[in-house]
Design a protein with these regions (language model features):
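FAD-dinucleotide binding site
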Residues: 3, 10-25, 35-502
């Protein structure tokens, strides 16, 4: 009996935030412009000092930088305010002192699907190339469950094919969940309230899957939605399933940016120049009449529009004057980012590529706390040289990881890797890196996860904004959680604002 198609299709372990979606961390740093454009003395009424042709963008991740580029092209004056001392938001490549032999790993947003056309177009605009990941990386990887170690293909073919068939039953049920939902308006679906009050766990429980199939499905959902299934709105799942493209298995998580994903936000920021102001966390927003005044990094900035291209979590520390409407404030307070963490270890030899089970790719699905892992060097480098193995922790595993120190988190994953791959036992891993996104002050998690009861209430608010304020970022797109989502959102907001008044 043949195993199922790629058992991690659709949102296949996406921070890949998405990510995640979705979207990760970026490694560019710089200094603030000595005279940031749009700086002014504080005014009593934003409408009096507002720059009619200026847009203030908060956040220099892919969403904010995309919006800024489009707005500049449309004739707007733009100021981009970034709280960190680097651009990129949740796109961050770790290299340099962290690893040797020129190796690098993505701490945040990682893989690109073949249908991520807006992101690929942006890469093409800046002359950046991609490098391919192995087409069969998942089925050629390792599944470690209850002491059993098999290739994922063999595991899925277990019980004379019943495991794979049961796994596919989950996805067949998703096909029937809400086949006529409009992903642009999930809140208007006729069963919106019913689905929104239910969790993904409720849906999976009703299927009564075989334990092995449930293990694979839970791994899919935990990685894809950056949370435990009981924390995810079923209406959000229906929306994401509806918007997903029908991509062949080899086209999912197919590539990375050659040389590191952080090159894209760096190139975008370089083109924008000194309109990007770093080390400028926003503390206050005044919004009235025909403009806004933003206080950030000790300076004030007047504009006609404000684009908040950042997660909602850091906005909870911003003072809005007057207070935002109740529905907007509730969405900002309620929409969380799922916890996500990555741990990357450098090994002198890629022991995972020659496993006794026949697994060769390094892609790992395990019932140990790390959950999911893959080779961060499966798209470049010497196959016979040193390599990087990265754990991607989400859900409960990520919450536990966030409670640990970096050293504790690394040591725990190193032990778990040695259990999953006994041949790694004793290999020295002096070169390591980790990021727990829930502990990142200006992010607060991996990528957005609407809880039960939130989609119908929050989605219209997220898309519409309020007054002179608009929202961008992966959490605002029909397809959520990807770097592609962030780029799409930037294009969308810029198109909504159009051209400046003459």
């Amino acid at each position: 009996v043949s195993p199922p198609a790629d058992p991690h299709r659709r949102r296949a372990l996406a921070v890949g935030l998405g990510a995640a979606a979705a979207a990760g961390l970026s490694a560019c740093s710089g200094s603030s412009s000595p005279e940031p454009p749009g700086t002014s003395a504080t005014t009593d009424d934003p409408s009096e000092g507002a720059a009619v042709g200026r847009v203030i963008v908060v956040g220099a991740g892919l969403a904010g930088l995309t919006a800024a580029l489009d707005l500049v092209d449309a004739g707007w004056e733009v100021v981009v305010l970034e709280a960190r001392t680097r651009v990129g938001g949740r796109v961050h490549t770790i290299r340099g002192e962290a690893f040797t032999e020129g190796l690098r790993a993505e701490a945040g947003g990682e893989s690109i699907d073949v249908d991520h056309t807006d992101l690929l177009a942006m890469l093409d605009r800046f002359g950046l190339e991609t490098e391919d990941r192995p087409a069969n990386k998942i089925l050629d990887g390792l599944t470690s469950w209850r002491g059993r170690r098999q290739t994922t293909a063999e595991f899925a073919a277990g019980r004379e094919g019943d495991v794979g068939a049961d796994y596919e039953r989950f996805y067949a049920a998703l096909d029937e969940l809400a086949p006529d939902i409009d992903p642009a308006h999930p809140d208007e679906y006729e069963r919106a309230d019913e689905l929104d009050q239910r969790s993904l766990a409720d849906f999976v429980d009703e299927l009564d899957l075989l334990p092995e199939a449930r293990f694979l499905v839970d791994a899919d959902n935990r990685g894809g939605f950056n949370a435990e299934a009981e924390d995810v709105s079923l209406l959000f799942v229906a929306q994401q399933w509806a918007v997903g493209e029908d991509v062949a298995d080899e086209g999912v998580e197919a590539m990375r940016v050659a040389g590191g994903n952080d090159q894209l936000p760096q190139a975008m920021a370089a083109e924008l120049g000194d309109v990007v102001v770093l080390d400028a966390p926003v503390t206050r927003v005044r919004h009235r009449g025909d403009g806004v005044t933003v206080t950030a990094g000790g300076a004030t900035y007047d504009g006609a529009w404000l684009v908040l291209a950042c997660p909602f979590t850091p906005l909870r520390a911003v003072a809005f004057d007057p207070p935002l409407p109740d529905d907007v404030a509730t969405a900002i307070e309620g929409l969380d980012l799922g916890p996500a963490a990555k741990v990357t270890l450098q090994y002198a030899e890629r022991g995972w590529a020659d496993d006794p089970t026949g697994a060769t790719s390094g892609f790992t699905v395990s019932d140990q706390p790390f959950g999911i892992a893959w080779s961060s060097t499966d798209s470049y480098g010497d196959p016979d040289g040193p390599g990087l193995l990265t754990a991607f922790l989400t859900g409960d595993g990520a919450e536990a990881a966030a409670a640990q120190t970096d050293a504790q988190r690394i040591e725990a994953v190193e032990r778990q890797f040695a259990e999953a791959y006994p041949q790694l036992e004793g290999q020295e891993t002096r070169h390591r890196a980790t990021v727990a996104w829930a502990k990142e002050r200006y992010t607060g998690g991996g990528y957005a996860v609407p809880h039960p009861g939130q989609v119908a209430a929050f989605w219209p608010v997220i898309r519409a904004g309020t007054g002179r304020i608009r929202f961008a970022g992966e959490h605002t797109e029909e397809l959520a959680g990807y770097m592609e989502s962030a780029v799409r959102s930037g294009h969308r907001i810029a198109a909504e604002l159009g051209t400046p008044p003459s």
